[in-house]
């Protein structure tokens, strides 16, 4: 067994602090990775603070982080896809049952027995899995992704969650040239949603509660920006959207956006506020509108998304921070003060 430097939280009220965690020796199908960057997803914060206690209670200590990129340092004897030195990524999943219909279809993200990168039972070491706020990780090669060589590694890290979570529903619901697409919430997920919708050829409208993000939204690829607190500006778009991606992390009025859908339009929730959202039947029935959800993506589609990013030169706009600033970053995340994803430089763990 190896040990790895990491940052963990001991309780839902504790800050993240330096610790040491065990990592297994690589088995025959395993890849050992030196983690170089890890994005900070709002899901990390929800989990550290046990905000999803009803659905997935947090086991402490927790080491979050599921937007991992790094270099392969060692591979097991049966590994065929990777060799030491390769640039790789690990997202939200590190295992699944591999036999259920969803796994067979490459939709491991919907496997009933999936192992999340952190806070899932660890089949190898007991306890729970530990995520990417650490300097190394060992993962079965099936759950390791290849990062295109032209992509900046810090900017590529958020693709592993924010990227696939926004790419997958857009592909599923047919976002293409000529479609009018809304993105609600210009945070980590939202800014990736804007980049993908634009790259897929759609007409893109950002809805934000932060007027100061207008210029950035346009720079990121939006054709139009609506400050969602402006009722008149909202009304101008009533009944016009083919697809809306809702990436808001907190309680909000989802009906205000459902009302903007055209006949048969679709609003997909990817944001995961802890409390249920109230949905007006009238918003849905007046226009045969659809409300759906989506959770990250399967392994084949995650690789497809990374390759798409390689071809289109798409990365996340990141603010790189040392791990010692992680608690401050969480407070800024709560104030929607991030442009547009924090990426932890794990070299900073060396001084711990
Ligand atoms: P984030 O970077 O914090 O962005 C969230 C954005 O939501 C903020 O920047 C803000 O955008 C908007 N917002 C925040 N509070 C709001 C409020 N009270 N009312 C209206 N808008 C508000 O978070 P993220 O990492 O992108 O994650 C977003 C959500 O998706 C989280 O709940 C996360 O857990 C979830 N998630 C889901 C999946 C999945 O697979 N489904 C994967 C990853 C994350 P503006 O300033 O533009 O208004
Ligand atoms: Zn995430």
Which ranges hold each PLM region?
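Glycine-rich beta-strand-centered segment in the early N-terminal region that forms part
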Residues: 24-38, 52-104, 109, 148-151
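NAD(P)H dinucleotide-binding glycine-rich loop of Rossmann-like/cofactor-binding domains
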Residues: 57, 81, 97-184
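Helix-to-beta-strand junctions that scaffold the AdoMet/dcAdoMet cofactor pocket
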Residues: 261-262
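Rossmann-fold NAD(P)-binding glycine/threonine-rich loop
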Residues: 271-287, 299-305
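Short N-terminal strand-loop motif that marks the start
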Residues: 1-69, 131, 135-139, 225, ...
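Glycine-rich Rossmann-fold phosphate-binding loop(s) that bind the pyrophosphate
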Residues: 162, 185-189, 272
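Adenosine-nucleotide cofactor-binding segment
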Residues: 177-186, 196-256
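C-terminal hydrophobic helical "lid"/dimerization subdomain
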Residues: 2-4, 299-352
């Amino acid at each position: 067994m190896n040990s790895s430097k990491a940052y963990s939280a001991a309780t839902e009220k504790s800050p993240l602090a330096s610790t040491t965690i065990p990592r297994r020796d690589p088995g025959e199908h395993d890849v050992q990775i030196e983690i170089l960057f890890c994005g900070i997803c709002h899901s990390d914060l929800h989990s550290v603070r046990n905000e999803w206690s009803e659905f997935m209670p947090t086991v402490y200590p927790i080491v979050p982080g599921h937007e991992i990129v790094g270099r392969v340092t060692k591979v097991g004897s049966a590994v065929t896809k990777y060799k030491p030195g390769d640039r790789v990524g690990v997202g939200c999943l590190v295992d699944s049952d591999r036999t259920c219909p969803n796994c067979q279809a490459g939709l491991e993200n919907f496997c009933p027995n999936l192992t999340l990168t952190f806070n899932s039972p660890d089949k190898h070491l007991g306890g729970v899995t530990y995520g990417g706020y650490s300097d190394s990780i060992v993962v079965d090669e099936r759950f390791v992704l290849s990062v295109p060589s032209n992509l900046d590694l810090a900017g590529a890290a958020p693709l592993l969650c924010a990227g696939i979570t926004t790419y997958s529903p857009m592909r599923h619901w047919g976002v293409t040239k000529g479609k009018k697409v809304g993105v609600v919430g210009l945070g980590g997920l939202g800014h990736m949603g804007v980049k993908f919708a634009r790259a897929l050829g759609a007409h893109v409208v950002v809805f934000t509660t932060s007027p100061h993000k207008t210029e950035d939204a346009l720079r990121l690829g939006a054709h139009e920006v609506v400050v969602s607190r402006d009722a008149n500006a909202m009304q101008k778009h009533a009944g016009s959207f083919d697809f809306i991606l809702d990436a808001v992390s907190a309680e909000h009025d989802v009906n205000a956006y459902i009302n903007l859908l055209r006949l048969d339009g679709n609003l997909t929730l990817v944001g995961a506020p802890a409390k249920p959202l109230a949905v007006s039947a009238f918003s849905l029935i007046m226009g045969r509108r659809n409300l759906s959800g989506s959770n990250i993506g399967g392994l084949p589609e995650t690789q497809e998304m990374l390759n798409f990013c390689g071809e289109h030169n798409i990365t996340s706009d990141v603010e790189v921070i040392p791990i010692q600033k992680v608690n401050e970053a969480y407070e800024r995340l709560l104030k929607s003060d991030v442009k547009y994803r924090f990426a932890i430089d794990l070299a900073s763990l060396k001084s711990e």
